Amino acid sequence: EYKRNMPGRIIGWSKDKYGKLCYRMALQTREQHIKREKATSNICTAQALLATMAGFYAVYHGQEGITTIASRIHSITVFLDKQLKKFGYTQVNAQYFDTLRFELPEHVSAQQIRTIALSKEVNLRYFENGNVGFSIDETTDVAAANVLLSIFAIAAGKDYQKVDDIPEKSNIDKTVKRTTPFLTHEVFNKYHTETEMMRYIKRLDRKDISLAQSMISLGSCTMKLNAAAEMLPLSRPEFMGMHPLVPEDQAEGYRELIKNLSEDLKVITGFAGVSLQPNSGAAGEYAGLRVIRAYLESIGQGHRNKVLIPASAHGTNPASAIQAGFVTVTCACDEQGNVEMADLRVKAEENKDELAALMITYPSTHGIFETEIKEICDIIHACGAQVYMDGANMNAQVGLTNPGFIGADVCHLNLHKTFASPHGGGGPGVGPICVAEHLVPFLPGHGIFGNSQNQVSAAPFGSAGILPITYGYIRMMGAEGLTQATKIAILNANYLATCLKDTYGVVYRGANGFVGHEMILECRKVHEEAGISENDIAKRLMDYGYHAPTLSFPVHGTLMIEPTESESLAELDNFVDVMLNIWKEIQEVKNGEADKDDNVLINAPHPEYEIVSDRWEHSYTREKAAYPIESVRDNKFWINVARVDNTLGDRKLLPTRYGTFE
């Protein structure tokens, strides 16, 4: 009943054309890139990478392992509860699993406990009312339990006896105790040795195409290299073992990294303040709009509630504006993909008394450097409103220009795009916001610092664990390297545009005839003349070993391509060869040389099981389907399923039984 109201991504079952079950992203038309201001949420970054890690944990341990771990955690918690009560502490949680909270005896203070705990290198939770608490997890062993005992015993002036073992005990009331089985699917009951688990993960890995195989040309996504040197800190416990709420003097290294990174981002954006708190670009948009609202309220302009957004903007812009409590007003774009200046002036004038902000992307979502960008900012400022710059395309700005110079007041950055932290598989994302001087006082705070204004994340610095990646990227590249990367990103996009302009054609170009860091390939004429859609081209690319570009965004019936600076000339040339060979295949359909109802494009992709089948009833050869050009032979990536039935997947979102569509 409510499936279309669910936020974020939904993965559901469907079947390919041969009846093989498969997964796909379902009900995509309900998401913000289609629904825009009518979307349920602005969520883009699903953080699926973290969910995958948790999933592997459950797969490896299974029901029995998880139960054993949980029982051990709870037993230690029960033991500590009983022992601390003997010391005069009162445990206030009637029902608990792993977390205890104690009222202290009259002669014991929280500061006493804090002093003793710190001397033993233990951090506890200290509540405002003087209570003290802690949580147990699977890393807590008998030795750690003895340390906790000693802290509370010493504070209370009690003797304590070290224990060598803790018996299995339960204090969970039967009314809330689970009795039904869980993790019953076969995947949670097969891979309980490291060898089997390793092979299972590798089998899954072989089904995914990634930058390890070839360029991922997704427009507006900036799928660049995540260099090994930048990733190394993620394996260091000094970074990964840090709790986000530890005392400041225990995180001096992190604080220095955060300070230096923030200073770097200020210089890069031309702004005066930074918050690293937002956990995604969409969260950054929301946070930035909250900052604008807080500023307007502070100067008596809190009635301003309208946000002007170009029609070309990414769908998260209007979705975030709605989430932040604003009303959106759409501004038209001209035939060249630029903001229609006449319409902008009219909309700004009509709404000037209520206008809070303009949200604009630069270069535009059409991949164009709009020459009027500074004039656009001036028009908005003249109305008393602020300019929010979407930093999704910052990869075409770094070192050449910046939002501050252009005239924006706030922007977000996608560290998982422009600044090289992992992007595929759902993040984890970081979407810091950078602001001009007058907005600095309204940046997100956090309760740990005694100021929770505009807080958008549970942790004060968001996903701080992956900040070392961006820090390493910026420091190793330096100003000259970052600028060169921007130039190469723009050069690569224009190289592809030049190579493909005489076949497919490029939808938009800037005033000087060039594109920005990405370009939109025209596919609508192909569909009219040959009956081949942009979807067919994207599916056929899989046979050549390439991930699909961005389909039908921001223009329906097109493909948006962004090569990034990471790709070599050899890889760009190979991609061009592939696209030109697909163009040749399209012409074969158009000219009647290939069957319009049975050709390599409308039947793509061709999985291995189809190619090796005894049954082959197509009008073209197996070789043409699987090895259309010589370069594919050296690095063939076999797609796992044939073309998927999208309608079935949306209509039958969940099977009634596992593996069936009855």
Where are these regions (language model features)?
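Structural preference for beta-strand elements that scaffold enzyme active sites
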Residues: 133, 215, 357, 384-388, ...
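Active-site-proximal helix-loop-helix substrate-binding element of RNase H-like nuclease domains
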Residues: 471
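Conserved PLP-enzyme active-site core in the AAT-like
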Residues: 1-22, 84, 101-102, 115, ...
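Short glycine-rich loop/turn motifs that provide flexible caps or phosphate-binding loops at active sites
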Residues: 61, 218, 280-283, 336, ...
